[in-house]
Amino acid sequence: MAIEEKRLILKYTDQPGYTNDIDCYIKHGGYEDLKKAFKMKPEDICEEVLQSGVRGRGGAGFPAGMKWKFLDRKSGKPIYLICNADESEPGTFKDRQIIHKDPHQ
């Protein structure tokens, strides 16, 4: 009996006609969750990310929502989210595949 695969990452990349440009991503529902996030309070976004179980991919698997809760929003300084796609581990190409095949995801 085959196990059905449910992709969360690279979800559409094998579909005919899918490309890595932004228009194609939007056509497949991309950025809908971002629109939702713009209507939410920062603490609610952090809580949703925490409840989702999303973890860092740096080896320690630290909960992303917990890390986001550590940000000092009262400082008045800008807050930036940075994507680190450096692959320092020999033989791993996960970040490269995501950035090349579905960069907007």
Located regions from the model:
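Feature of Fe-S/electron-transfer and energy-metabolism proteins
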Residues: 1-105
